Amino acid sequence: MGVPVAPSQSLVAQFDTLWTRFDEIYPSFAYKGVDWRAQRATYRPRAQRARSQDELIGVLVEMLTPLRDLHVWLVDPRGQAVPTFRPAGLANFDRTRWESAMRDASYLAHSRDFGEGMVGGYAYLYIGAWKDPVSQESLDLALARMRDAPGLIIDVRSNPGGTDQTALAFAGRFTTRAFTASYVEIRTDSLVKDVEMPLARTISPRGGWQFTRPVVVLSGRGGFSATESFVAAMRTLPQVTVLGDTTGGASGNPATFALGNGWRFTVPRWLEFGPDRRPIEGRGVAPHLAMSWDPTHYDGARDPLIDAAVGLLGERNGVYRIAPAPSREAPVETPTDRGLRR
């Protein structure tokens, strides 16, 4: 049981603070099918009856859960996040298998979330987050070391996000022309009439040269936020194949606000769409080639997606051909005996 808070009006004031911030900023009520005023009518009386901070937090979590938004959470005074939604997604990244694969890859770990190596004669780059120590400079330096590689694997399966600017700037190293990477829709003040929504986000070529050889991006349900912006951008480029699973479907660019009694809460500020203008929120970004993740079907402790990526790069470089996918979802025979589905 939580410590009582006196007077109880302070709990109602916290409720009103959170509800009002969402009412002013959150862009996705209609998209999520949530009547926010109805939520207030249902949950404010319960906030009035709450007798402790913990009781209020329980009420707020219940009110926010129908948004099904991974960027909506509360933060306690110790800095621990309290989620309002947990997706039931299957991961396609097993760190034990990955570490086993990296032992054969001359892998150089710059940090837990960033490293590079060579797999099957192709450059490999693991990006586990878009935040320090991963930066535009560190990514540029890694790419410079891979400049002469016949192909590149970029692994972002387990990347939960970080700084959009870093992710999109890196995508600029793979294009020779400017293009629209995504669109974002934000709430605007009623007095602002000259801003047309959604806003286009454009990527331009960056750096003195661009990597235009074949690239495979490994994606999965563990990729969120800035990673989804990156995958959505990369999958439009002609030399890029996205392999794996659909991304997690959470791209909201949240801001953090004070709630009261040391608590804070987040409010997503935009609804993002891919270059095809389909929402990313709740849907994710699909791969070009979907590959089921059932490691029990594979020999030893290898990482099947990395093996499949090597096979794809071999095909792109004319080393060998991957058999076309059959009409039904049966495993496809490839040079690495890995199943791919178009």
Predicted regions and their residues:
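Catalytic cores of large soluble enzymes that bind and process phosphate-bearing ligands
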Residues: 10, 51, 55, 222, ...
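Flexible, low-complexity junctional segments that flank or bridge functional domains
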Residues: 1-203, 254-258, 264, 312-342
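Extracytoplasmic/peripheral linker and loop segments enriched in polar/acidic and small residues
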Residues: 288-330
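Conserved acidic, small-residue-rich alpha-beta core segments centered on
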Residues: 165-302
